[in-house]
Design a protein with these regions (language model features):
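A short, conserved alpha-helix in the catalytic core of glycosyltransferases
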Residues: 102-106, 160-185, 189-220
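Active-site acidic Asp-centered loop
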Residues: 41, 91-94, 188
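Acidic donor-binding segment of Leloir-type glycosyltransferases
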Residues: 26-68
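Conserved donor NDP-sugar-binding/catalytic core segment of glycosyltransferases
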Residues: 95-141
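Short aromatic/hydrophobic "clamp" motif used to bind/position activated sugar donors
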Residues: 88
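N-proximal low-complexity "stem/linker" segments adjacent to membrane-targeting elements
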Residues: 1-27
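C-terminal, non-catalytic tails of nucleotide-sugar-dependent glycosyltransferases
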Residues: 1-5, 116, 126, 138-165, ...
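Glycine-rich, basic loop-to-helix element that forms the pyrophosphate-binding segment
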Residues: 66-83
């Protein structure tokens, strides 16, 4: 069968970005049974509302309004409450579809009994990688692998190009069974900006489901345009709070290391290079 997929896209003020995203879905998606839920967050320009009105004429599009401040987790949870599909597809507004089979490919992996969520390969407009899976502990809490590597390269042990289980993937484009999302309690709303996708994936894994990275789906990602500007001091403080939250809640995996990552490999370099050995680089007296 062809289950309904609910695509959830948060948006604020961005008309061109959103339009490029939505048009790429309409024009390029071979799979037909989907709805798009746009969660409008405090836009004020006449231009964006004109575009919303035009979009709303399409029966596949549902526009809902989140009137509180920016909180990525709360906005997406709100979107899910309006979703009719059994499958959720979280999508950033600055992502563009490349391949017609993207949704059906994600769905075929997500429909497997053991799969909880599916992430994909995201590439920058210059054809380098932005996301090919995440590793817990990378750069502190978690980080994307193979960042800035040319997209056609396969990387260490071909990992950038192999379908595989991982601890987490980014929610810039992530499909999840709705029942799995609800069982995990959705996105953690204390994590307003950072690590909410990592946290959700770890919750899903703790319920016994797998997180799968699917490199056969590639989308362009124009990176974080959907957040308003804010006071940088407040930003830093909030980021620290979110790091603390992750440290407290996921102490065990942060201590033991990501089960899908070799503990002899670096946690500061995303390219699977070896950790320096103790004493390396010291001059002999």
């Amino acid at each position: 069968g062809e289950p309904l997929v609910s695509v959830v896209i948060p948006n604020r003020e961005e008309k061109e970005t959103l339009q490029a995203c939505v048009e790429s879905i309409f024009e390029k998606t071979a799979y037909k049974n989907y709805e798009i839920i746009i969660v409008e967050n405090n836009s004020s320009s006449e231009e964006i509302f004109r575009y919303y009105r035009k979009l709303s004429e399409d029966p596949r599009v549902h526009l809902i309004r989140w009137k509180k401040g920016f909180n990525y987790s709360a906005i997406n949870n709100f979107g899910v409450r309006h979703a009719k599909g059994d499958y959720l597809l979280f999508l950033n507004n600055d992502v563009k579809v490349i391949d017609p089979d993207w949704m059906s490919e994600m769905l075929s992996v997500c429909q497997r009994k053991e799969t909880g969520a599916v992430g994909v390969k995201l590439i920058y407009p210059d054809n380098t990688i932005q996301h090919a899976g995440c590793v817990v502990g990378m750069g502190g809490i978690a980080g994307n692998m193979f960042v800035n590597m040319p997209a056609e390269r396969t990387g260490y042990l071909h990992k950038a190009s192999l379908l595989q289980d991982m601890s987490c993937v980014t929610a810039a484009c992530m499909m999840m069974k709705k029942e799995v999302f609800l069982e995990a309690g959705g996105f953690t709303e204390e994590l307003a900006v950072a690590f909410n996708d990592v946290d959700l994936c770890l919750k899903v894994r703790s319920h016994g489901h797998l997180i799968v990275y699917d490199p056969y789906v590639k989308l362009y990602h124009y990176e974080s345009k959907s957040r308003g500007t804010e006071d940088s001091e407040e930003k830093v403080r909030r980021f620290q709070t979110e790091i603390e939250y992750m440290r407290c809640h996921w102490l065990d995996i942060l201590k033991k290391g990501d089960p899908y990552y070799n503990k002899n490999l670096s946690l500061t370099k995303w390219n699977y290079s070896l950790k320096p050995l103790p004493g390396m680089g010291k001059k002999k007296g």
